Structure formats: structure tokens, C-alpha cells
């Protein structure tokens, strides 16, 4: 018998005035997976997660968390979930240890405060005031507050936004350790590398709807192209899109201002004829970059916009 889903969302809608924050969203998150909600700011990710956390009310649709619903089972659900908000405001004057003892007192069971402090690598800071912690330490502290009740399901809203690369990787390690214990994680992010590393499956959300769903590998494979060539040209005649599409191995052509993007199968198949074409037109590359296709490219190909655009 398949395990019941950790989170089940059907026909979820939420309006703020005339704005549709969430517009008929359907999702099912399996027990034990790390699931990513991916999308630009304003896509409806945070609203969806807040409704799942019981912090916000849907206008219509059903949301079932761990087989329960907030309207009838809030007291049962609260101790079973952990929540790390986009910005967690903790009492600045309390120490790390005092804060975690306070949060631990809200739950019947769970790990000791010492265990959690060790897990999030804040042993050396246990007597420091929360206000003295760095950005990365504060994010690990927020995660510790979410873990102290030993949750079955962990909600992380943009857990590494604003962190330096080292702090981001430390937090990724902690999330992976939590998932390795068979727990479920729902995270929102607009960092593609984060989603590709942590998530078993992702849903790409835009304008409050799921526009793509699958493993990171499946979604990238759906592009049909392994590489992206990005270039700008020196002054001169620019080839038109049809000429570019006629080159070997080109699946799609996009333009953003002066920049031209080609989604291609193999570099050796496309670059030599591209160089010949540009030479014939009396122009050349002002700038040239290539990268392996990512979830960012999937999003751009679906929406025509970058994930980082406000």
C-alpha cells in the first residue's frame, strides 16, 4: 500500500483584492521526499506554503497535511511540523541556548537542546546573544527552532536567500541530514543550484499555477537540449532567428535585448557553422558563454522570463 502523501493540495485559490496569488494549484508531496516549489517572486510560493503551515486561509480548495486539515486538527498538526519562515524574528537579547530551551518547551517530545545545537553547528555560539549572530548563523538558528520539536514535515521558505556560498552549503548539508532520516521537506527557492542539489522533485510555479512538475533531471531533459550558448555580437548584421534555427543541433532561439541564446544538443555541432555564418555577415562575438542546461533554462523556456526578474 503506498504511503499517504505528506501534503495534498487540490484546487487551491487565494486572492488579495484583485490579485490572484494562487490560482487553482494542485500538488501532491510524497512522504520522505524533498520537494521544491520553484518560481520568481510573486509566483505564489510563499502564500501556498503559509496555507500549508496553517498561517493563512485559502479562499477555496482543500489542503491536507499528514492526513489532517487545519480547520479541524490544528492541535494535532502543530507539534508534527517544523517551520522556518523567510524571515524569522527571534528575541535578539536571548542567547542561542535560551532561545532553543524556550522553543523546546513548546513540545512534549523531541531531541535535547544540546543535540540540536550540535546538529546546526552552533556549539561555539550557544552563549552568544541571537543579535550577535551572522546571517548564516541566524538561518541555522531558525532551522534549529524548526527542528527542536522533532517534526515529520519541515517547511523552509527561501532558506538560503542572502547567504554567502559557504553558509548556503552548510545549510544544504543540514537539510540533507534531516531528509536522510526519512522526513519530508517542502522548500521554496529561486536558486536553481539549490533545487537541483536538494530536491527529489520540483514544481515550477508561475502566476499561482504549476506549469511543470518532475525531477530536476526530467525537467531539464524535457528541453531536448543539453547546452545553452549565450552571446552578444560586435557591430554588424545580426542573423535572424530562422537562420540560427537552421544551424545544426539548434532546438530553440531566444533573445533578451542584445543577447542571443541558443538551446543546442552538442557544442561541436553548432559552434563551427555559427562562426562561419557570423564571418559571412562581417561580424563576430563581443561575448560568448556556454553552460549545461539547468532548471533556470527550463523556466525561461516555459515563461520567457528569468527566475530572478522582479
Q: Residue locations for each model-derived region?
A:
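ABC transporter nucleotide-binding domain
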Residues: 173-265
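A generic structural signal for secondary-structure junctions
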Residues: 82, 104, 108, 221-225, ...
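ABC-family P-loop ATPase nucleotide-binding domain
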Residues: 1-13, 305-310
